[in-house]
Amino acid sequence: MLSKCRFVAGVQDKHSLPDFQVPEVAFAGRSNVGKSSLINAVTKNKKGARVSSNPGSTRQINFYLNEGALALVDLPGYGYSKASKESASSYMSLVEHYLLTREALHRLVLLIDSKVGLKEVDMDFISWLEERCIHYSLVLTKIDRLACTEFNDVLSAVQSRVKGCCMLLHPIIGTSSKSGKGIKELVHEVSKCVKEWPGGRDVRA
C-alpha cells in the first residue's frame, strides 16, 4: 500500500508545516543512518527520497504522502559533527517542535546503524523521548553488512541497552534497503497506523 507514496513538501520552518489530516510516521536517526534509503525501500520508489553519501544533507523535514491515507516523514539526522552550531540548532529545533506538537504523529521510527550499534548520541535522543513520554520503535539498518551471528550480537547488545525503556514499542526490526530484508515487516508495522487511526493511541503517552 505504500508504493504510491510521493514527495509533497520539504519544510524548514515550523510555521510552514502542512496539515494533511492523515496519520504520520516519522523516521529519525543519526546522520547517514540510511533514513532516505529506507523510505525508498518501504515505498518501492528508488527516486522518492534523495539519497546522499554526505552526512547531514537532510536539513529540512520532508513529507511523503500516500494517497491521502498516510504520510511518511523524513526528519533531519542528528549528531553530524561538521554542521555549524547555528545550523544544527536551527534544524534540530524544528525537529523538536515537530515531535512535541504534531497531533498527526502516530509513530516515530528511530533508526540505528547495525554496523556501529547504539552510540551515546542515540541514547541521549532516546532519553529525550523517554522524558517527554514519546513512543518510538527501533529499526536496525544496513544488516546486509553483517553476518547472521554478528547481527544477533548487535541485536542483543541493543536490547540490553534499552531494557527498561518505557516508551519503546516492540519488536525491534532488522532491515536492509539493499537486500530488502525486514522491509516487509516494517511495512506491516507502518501500515497498522492507518488501521489504528484515529481511534488508536497517539504516539505521545
Curated annotation (Swiss-Prot):
Q: Where does GTP bind?
A: 29-36, 56-60, 74-77, 141-144, 172-177
Task: Name the coenzymes or cofactors required.
Answer: Mg(2+)
The cross-references to Gene3D superfamilies, in alphabetical order and at most eight, read:
P-loop containing nucleotide triphosphate hydrolases
What does the entry give for GO biological process? division septum assembly
Task: Check the record and name the InterPro entries matching this protein.
Answer: G_ENGB_dom, GTP-bd, GTP-bd_ribosome_bio_YsxC, P-loop_NTPase
UniProtKB keywords = Cell cycle, Cell division, GTP-binding, Magnesium, Metal-binding, Nucleotide-binding, Septation
- A Pfam family the protein falls into: MMR_HSR1
Q: Which GO terms describe its molecular function?
A: GTP binding; metal ion binding
Asked if the keyword Metal-binding belongs to this entry, the reply reads yes
| Protein residues bound to Mg(2+) | 36, 58
Source organism, top-level taxon: Bacteria
UniProt keyword Cell division present:
yes
User: Residues in domain EngB-type G?
Assistant: 21-196
The entry sums up its family as follows: Belongs to the TRAFAC class TrmE-Era-EngA-EngB-Septin-like GTPase superfamily. EngB GTPase family.
PANTHER family hit by this protein: ENGB-TYPE G DOMAIN-CONTAINING PROTEIN, MSS1/TRME-RELATED GTP-BINDING PROTEIN
Q: Which NCBIfam families match?
A: GTPase_YsxC (TIGR03598)
Q: What does this protein do?
A: Necessary for normal cell division and for the maintenance of normal septation.
Protein name as it appears in the record: Probable GTP-binding protein EngB
Q: Gene of origin?
A: engB
